[in-house]
Amino acid sequence: GTITVNSDDKYLDFNTRNMLEWILFKNKYSSKIKAAYLTEKYNYYENKNSDTYTFGQVNSLFLRHDFLYSISESITINTLLDFTQSDAKGSDLLTETRTIGTGSILWKHKLSTKLNYELGIRQEVTDTYESPLLFSAGTSFALTEYYTIKANLSKNFRIPTFNDLYWQGSGNPDLNPEHSLQGEISNEFSYKNSKFVLTGFLIQLKDMIRWIPKSNGLWQPENTQNVTNYGLEMLFETKKSIGKHLFSFTTSYGYTVSENNETEKQLTYVPNHKANANLAYNYKSFTTYYQWMYTGEVFTSSDNFYKLDDYALSNIGIDYNFGKKKTYLLGFQVLNLTNENYQNVISRPMPGRNFKLYLTLNL
């Protein structure tokens, strides 16, 4: 619910993930085969006190063959073959099956100890959408021991997901696939245990798929015909070891312009400024940390008249890993430590100070 729209609904979901992997290593090549089966199901109760509900269910089979061959010490070629079949059913559709096949080739060439490049092509075939031939290109050049410059260019394509198309009460079956062309240049400075990265990026998108909150309180996906994203990202990280004690600090800042080319206005709910910082202390299997996150103001109307204020949040946490070769992680967090009153969507107040206890098992 929201401040202006009351809600008495309930949402239940149940998901499973199962995967098998076979790996073969030889002198000049490696071969990996993965098979995964995923199930996703949800029930939505408009009235949580009623037994009446709508539902959606997707069962997906994923197959992948990853083959890597070393032509020489400086050249490798990597081929990827992917197959996905998803069967969906739900209250808003009888049955829907989507089959996707993908082939990719990636060439990597290390010209010297300082300079390398890579080239890739990718073709996706579906029974629903016509996909263009996609490409990627990248290079990395270490000008000095402390400074490396990197550049990447790629053409991308994304088809709407089942949730985009058929989510109960919110899906949009008329969505078009999203096309994009993006490039970035990164400058990486490193010294001992510290690193600073400055990245500039530019992305041109056609039919961008975005979920937008509507006046009735529901989020719905739509295409925005032409969008330009550009900006800067900065990252700094450092760490210091004293015996078995490890201290680490990471901070980042991003400035993003995401503009509708027709209106020349910033897209709704995309902040110009985002920043975060993380300070952590580790001793053997014990870790404690402090997190700080800042989100700048966002516009809530396409004419950029209405907006939500910026906010900053703090979290603290502690965890202990009981495993040695495996992960058995028990942790506790205090979220929104300062009890900040904020909204990241209009009329939807976010939780105040709250607590989280978690157990992570990696068998």
Regions found by a protein language model. Name each.
Residues 18-24, 63-69, 105-109, 137-141, ...:
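Residues on the lipid-exposed face of transmembrane beta-strands in outer-membrane beta-barrel proteins
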Residues 112, 202-204, 223-299, 324, ...:
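Gram-negative outer-membrane beta-barrel transporters
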Residues 26-28, 37-41, 83-89, 99, ...:
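Transmembrane beta-strands of outer-membrane beta-barrel pores
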Residues 204-206, 297-300, 318-363:
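C-terminal beta-signal and adjacent terminal beta-strands/loops
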Residues 72-78, 85-205, 250-252:
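Structural signature of Gram-negative outer-membrane beta-barrels, strongest in the C-terminal barrel
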Residues 31-35, 75-79, 117-119, 149-151, ...:
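Transmembrane beta-strands of outer-membrane beta-barrel proteins
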